[in-house]
Amino acid sequence: MKYNTHTLDNGLRIIHLPSDSKVVYCGYQINAGTRNEEPGEEGLAHFCEHVTFKGTERRKAWHILNCLESVGGDLNAYTNKEGTVYYSAILKEHIARAVDLLSDIVFHSVYPQAEIDKEVEVICDEIESYNDSPAELIYDEFENILFKGSSLGHNILGTAEQVRSFTTEDALRFTRKLYRPDNAIFFAYGDIDFKKLVKLVGRALADDDSGKLAEEDCHADFSGGTGFAGDENSITTEKSVSSVKSVGPKNYPSVGEEIAGQTIVMQKNTHQAHVMIGTRAYDVNDDRRMPLYLLNNILGGPGMNAKLNLALREHNGLVYTVESTMVAYGDTGTWSIYFGCDEHDIKRCLRLVRKELDRMMEKPLSASQLKAAKKQIKGQIGVACDNRENFALDFGKSFLHYGWEKNVDCLYEQVEAITSQQIQDVARELFDKDRLITLIFK
């Protein structure tokens, strides 16, 4: 894959992957997530994402909403623990419009208090909707247990009380500190001329470096080792660059002896019990991450033939949903299993889960099992990469935080290099019953 890259004088990195599509996916990935919030600011990163659409020095809220919609485009944003993303999907003939709008809202929003007062209620409704979904809420509560006392521990949305306290001044303080060109990247995936793109972005940011694009900047063929950033569906090539910013302080605590191996029950008065089992795992740079990637897919990946799905759903009819998940942050990670079941089936489900974990710890995969697992995950990767929007968002995220660019062929090579012994070693380390924490909502 041939990526085009260029860095403006103001520090903004631009990355572009050509495609034959008439649709361009582009936007800003900013190193400003919930990990960057100070105590008392919980929910501020997500709040800023919402109110960034509410007016700039040049545009009112209505003009922002209508700018791309009027030509059939899409404007969207999201916040996670390590970043905030503003992006668009637009026909390539409207790329100048998208670049100008995105640059305007990211770097020139004024956050009018009158608009904030309205949007706060929208955010609070989002919080209430989330609180009504225990299958989602349990993931945040689980991370709060794993990373209690750190910025990774609190959820992205914050509380309604906290959100209602935020003002224009709070949004300006947070974004002026973090929404900077040298703390962001602009990504684009589509059939557009890269030199033109650099000039458009430079002009939108009034950067006089935009006309100094050298020919050698236009053709960077990155083909290093492979990996994935963030979660098990993110795919990238590992190639470090010196300008990569830290994703956050290493302020997470170790899982304490008081909770390691323990079961924590929370009364939520739900119709169904919700259960998570897991532990802290590997960061995005850890060599054990790829064996865990494959192991996780074997156990609880999206395939109906995943071991946990067969054990709990297909063979015993105990659950509708069971899945395992891994998340790799810049300096730590998580691995967990989730399932929902009737309350009286909790113990039986836990025994079946433990049985599958013990099997992975005690017996290495046979050569045929390993070959089948690799074939399956490579197929899933190929299908996932066909989603152009997700592909664009992922390579932008990877380049911002880790200096890696997607290279699916290299990822396939690294999948092929995984051994049964590596998988068993990871299973023995992570699946130790004295290490795992169990959280139950009922």
Regions found by a protein language model. Name each.
Residues P18-D20, G27-Q29, G248-N305:
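His/Glu-based metal-binding/catalytic segments typifying zinc-dependent metallopeptidases
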Residues M1-N10:
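Short, Gly/Pro- and small/polar-rich lid/capping loops
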Residues S19, G33, T56, L91, ...:
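Solvent-exposed coil/turn segments that connect beta secondary-structure elements
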Residues R13-I15, Q414:
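Residues located in well-ordered beta-strands
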